[in-house]
């Protein structure tokens, strides 16, 4: 998108021109067609491709399959981080992200949750051969993102550290528009319900779930870490004399289009309880009778949970 007609100002026009030609060639050969369909299904399951149909019945099937990109805000125990690259010069392609969720269930059935977000900018080592104008090379640009953290429902924010202060965030210099701008009613209402907390963290509500938001700027060749600490009252029902088994589960949500994100979820339970069964099996480790940890690349939504028994 660096070389295009600036007067026409359609940097993505090549995609509109190329798509019908590419699809026609891919679907002509039966063998290629099968590989193409397998690739499309894989991309949809990993949220690299989102599908929308005007037919409501068909669209509902896409939602049920997880191919529509709908955010599951109604789920009680969400573990989600949404990242928006704003004036980040396409530098996300060089950034590794690690999400560490540490969930410690207390004897009173509350939970202490710590989320550690680490972003590492590998532009200088990976973008050496990138053929773009030197002044526009994203490998050597700051990675500027606005992140929204969606913790489990009812989470109370205890502390946050490591965020970039709003005054330190690079700002775009935009020209004065020729036409008068009219505030969008939905955006105005969304912003009205937000609260700015100490340090510049923002608390809000979107897509049926509460979130906490912050800026994060990572320079080329460096790492940046943000840590959130929450308390979740009445997080779950522990096994008891009258109900000797219970279940705890959380949905680790993958952001559509995201790549290079790795996640770790650690579940810790109090004395008197043991883990009878845990998921997922792939990437999961039973650290002890009362602790289960999952590690893996976040390629799709992943349910992490355990069946608990009273000892």
Segments (PLM) and residue ranges:
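Lumenal/extracellular ectodomains and adaptor appendage modules
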Residues: 1-311
């Amino acid at each position: 998108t660096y070389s295009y007609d600036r007067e026409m100002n359609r940097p993505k026009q090549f995609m509109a021109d190329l798509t019908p030609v590419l699809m026609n060639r891919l679907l002509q050969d039966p063998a290629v067609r099968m590989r193409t369909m397998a690739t499309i299904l894989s991309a949809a399951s990993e949220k690299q491709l989102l599908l929308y149909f005007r037919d409501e019945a068909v669209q509902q099937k896409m939602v049920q399959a997880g191919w529509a990109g709908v955010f599951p805000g109604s789920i009680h125990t969400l573990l989600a981080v949404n990242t928006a690259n704003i004036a980040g010069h396409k530098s996300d392609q060089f950034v590794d992200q690690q999400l560490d969720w540490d969930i410690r269930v207390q004897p009173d059935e509350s939970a202490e949750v710590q989320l550690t977000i680490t972003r590492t900018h590998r532009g200088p080592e990976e973008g050496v051969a990138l053929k773009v104008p030197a002044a526009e090379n994203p490998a050597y640009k700051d990675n500027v993102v606005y992140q929204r953290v969606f913790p489990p429902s009812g989470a109370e924010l205890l502390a946050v550290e490591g965020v970039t202060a709003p005054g330190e965030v690079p700002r775009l210099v935009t020209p004065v528009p020729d036409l008068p701008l009219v505030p969008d009613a939905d955006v105005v209402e969304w912003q009205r319900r937000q609260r700015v907390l100490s340090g510049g963290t923002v608390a809000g509500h979107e897509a049926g779930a509460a979130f906490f938001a912050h800026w994060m700027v990572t320079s080329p060749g460096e790492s940046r870490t943000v840590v959130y600490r929450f308390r979740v009252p009445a997080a779950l029902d522990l096994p008891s004399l009258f109900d000797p088994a219970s279940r705890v589960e959380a949905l680790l949500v993958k952001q559509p289009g995201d790549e290079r994100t790795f996640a770790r979820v650690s579940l810790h339970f109090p004395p008197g309880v043991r883990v009878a069964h845990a998921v997922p099996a792939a990437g999961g480790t039973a650290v002890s009778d009362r602790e289960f940890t999952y590690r893996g690349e976040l390629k799709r939504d992943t349910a992490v949970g355990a069946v608990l028994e009273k000892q």
